[in-house]
Amino acid sequence: MTEQNTLEANKGLMRRWFEEVWNQGRVEAIHEMMSEDCINHGLSEDPGQPLRGASGFLPFHTQFREAFPNIEVVVEDVIAEGDKVVARCSVRGKHEGDSLGMKATHAMVDFDGIAIARVKAGMFVESWNSFDFARMYKQLAV
């Protein structure tokens, strides 16, 4: 595979991640795209403790999808360089589930985020995530 083909494949993997894992809620897609050795930074309640592997990521995903069952993530931009791929996203959803430590507020939220991932052999092996969860919680009046 040429370098250009690898970059395009990595961009496709990132787009597929947000479409299948978040928009469609396909849990099995997590295991298809994320290495069990993957280190996920920026998603844990304890910033110093990354979520490890698909099994470590799954509780975060489950809680978030329970709170926002119809979440919509729009990938605005995707950039790839070397073994890394970056996505700039807009997130929208209605807080309809009792999860994330609170009762459903039925409030609409919208916030933005950036995800950077390192890809090896077509799988995510490390990610750095910066989503504006403070804005999300403010919209939930928490």
Language model features: what each stretch is:
Residues 1-142:
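C-terminal and inter-domain tail/linker signature
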